[in-house]
Regions:
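Hydrophobic membrane-insertion alpha-helices, especially the h-region
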Residues: 20-33
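Long, hydrophobic alpha-helical segments that serve as membrane-spanning/inserting helices
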Residues: 1-15, 36-255
């Protein structure tokens, strides 16, 4: 009678299982590294895209600052002339005509608005965490601080203009102003025979005092505009160098 023997498979050594584990671990780890590298690449591309967009915003901002600065300088010149002429008492007919003209040249609000599309994304969508370069992040925050400061000074300047309107409406007849079609220069001239509504020296003195306040705030506004422009140009340069981007070089304030 034949006896059948069961075949015995050779047991695998523990080193075999160790190598299987190592190979599996390496496969998972390499996959993790590849995915991590991919995420870093995507974030780096997003960072660079943000910087390109911010660069374009900064170019627009510097143009805006230069434009508003020129207008503020012109208006300040009219304000100073208005103060000097208004302190002459009593005003002659020729002086009244000049005061009307200068009043018409100093009423426009010197508003400014910065491009905030990219900045809003950086602030609200967690974009700042993508900015790996500390020098860039610091320069961006400093620029934002300058913008906020400019807005505060702008609002105070607007308030000064509103307080002037309360008094000027009791001094000047609007009918003597010759209107223009240019929104940037709404008064083109003054009609002959211009008179004050109330030729009251105390009222005129109050008006001139408020004009002086606006002139002071305009000077502060000019200084803030210059600081803002320096900050914008500094940020432009830092971004261009850090990310090897090109942009039109901004010129200093044209005075």
């Amino acid at each position: 009678m034949e006896v059948h023997h069961h075949a015995h498979t050779e047991r695998k050594k523990w080193t075999h299982y160790l190598w299987e584990f190592i190979m599996l671990f390496l496969a998972v780890f390499c996959g993790f590294l590849a995915e991590n590298q991919r995420e870093h690449y995507i974030e780096h591309q997003r960072e660079k895209q943000y910087m390109r967009s911010l660069l374009e915003d900064l170019q627009t901002d510097t143009t805006t600052i230069n434009r508003v600065h020129r207008r503020a300088l012109t208006q300040l010149s009219f304000l100073d002339s208005l103060i000097e002429l208004g302190n002459h008492s009593p005003a002659k007919a020729d002086d009244i005509h000049k005061l009307y003209f200068l009043q018409g040249k100093t009423t426009r609000f010197l508003n400014i608005r910065f491009e905030d599309g990219t900045s809003s994304q950086l602030k609200n969508a967690g974009g700042m965490r993508l900015i790996r370069k500390e020098e860039v992040a610091k320069a961006i925050r400093e620029y934002w601080d300058h913008i906020e400061s400019l807005y505060r000074v702008r609002d105070r300047l607007e308030l000064a203009g509103e307080t002037i309107a309360d008094v000027s409406s009791r001094i000047f007849y609007t009918g003597y102003f010759i209107k223009s079609d240019d929104p940037l220069d709404p008064v083109s001239g003054i009609k002959t025979g211009a008179k004050f509504i109330y030729d009251d020296q105390r009222l005129i003195a109050e008006y001139i005092n408020r004009i002086a306040t606006k002139a002071t705030r305009t000077r502060i506004y000019l200084a803030e505009l210059e600081d803002g422009l320096r900050s914008a140009n500094n940020l432009l340069q830092i971004i261009k160098e850090a990310y090897h981007l090109s942009a039109d070089r901004r010129t200093p304030l044209e005075k």
